[in-house]
Amino acid sequence: MLHLTNLQTKGYDELIEINGEVVYQVFAIKKNNGTYSTYYYTVPKNKLDQAEDYEIEEFNEFNELELAIKHIQSKGANLLRFNIFKGNKPL
């Protein structure tokens, strides 16, 4: 199970091939005073320079960690890859 302390953001980014197309993805979960925010971002790698036209960016909020985890996993996240974000955080 994923463990988060208050105001901590965990997740990862990756380049992955999906249906023959390489895409850049970001997955994240943040705990904030009993609520859990999720972040999902994806854009085709060959469209990174035009991301605003091709990206999908989603922010969601949940009252339970289990619901946040189920949601982010439904987007393709692998919880085993989640780690503390360093530098620029998506949430």
Cite the ranges covered by each PLM segment.
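Negatively charged, low-complexity tracts enriched in Asp/Glu with abundant Ser/Thr
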Residues: 1-22
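Short, exposed beta-strand/loop patches in secreted or surface proteins that constitute
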Residues: 16, 28-29, 59-62
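Generic low-polarity alpha-helical segments
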Residues: 24, 36-38, 68, 72
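Generic "edge-of-domain/loop-turn" microfeature
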Residues: 14-17, 23, 33, 45, ...
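Short aromatic-glycine-(Arg/Gly/Cys) micro-motifs in beta-strand/loop hairpins
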Residues: 26-56
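Intrinsic-disorder/low-complexity loop/linker signature
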Residues: 20-21, 34, 49, 88
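Mixed-charge, Lys/Arg-enriched low-complexity segments
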Residues: 1-7, 47-91
